Amino acid sequence: MSWQTQKLETVADFCLGKMLDQNKNRGEPLPYLANINVRWGEFDLSDLRKMRFEQHELERYGLKYGDIVMCEGGEPGRCALWKEQYSSMMVQKALHRIRPHDCLWPEFLYYFFLFKGRTGHLASLFTGSTIKHLPREKLALIEVPVPPQSTQIQIASVLSAYDDLIENNRRRMALLEEAARQ
């Protein structure tokens, strides 16, 4: 069994977030994610900043359920799946916003990138000697497997169930450690 592969640029819309420039930015102040807010598989929403966005920028830089947010610099490839954890969220320049087309289940593409990023498979695409970057042009050429949608859903469901078990165990361990300290 082999799956068709396609370049990311043919199976998803993606862009870098908006450049932070207080002198030029106009519009409504909205919360945005920066590189520091993206963790492996989750978001840290405890310290959100705001930037001005104009109406015509909302579609491009705004997040929708199922978007993958990936770090472009610092620790390129670090990513998480947006599930509308916060309303009217936007993205800043150091992040790629990846929105899969209908041929890809968002969770499947997320787990694909999580695997590629955590195992170092994206490293050959990085540029920069001191601070690494994953440029849009290189991201566009990544070959993405496109199995039948039912297979994508099954794979994502199994991996999500394991993630839930891991998170549940983390919470239990934290409770046990807290109880042991008392």
Tell me what each language-model feature is.
Residues 34-35, 52-116, 135:
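A short beta-sheet element
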Residues 38, 75-76, 127-128:
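Short glycine-enriched loops at secondary-structure junctions
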Residues 29, 47, 92-94:
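A generic structural signal for short beta-strands and their flanking turns/coil linkers
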Residues 2, 89-96, 127-156:
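A short glycine-rich beta-alpha junction/loop motif
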Residues 5-24, 36-68, 85:
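Sequence-specific dsDNA recognition surfaces
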Residues 1-18, 141-182:
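Non-catalytic DNA-recognition/assembly elements of restriction-modification systems
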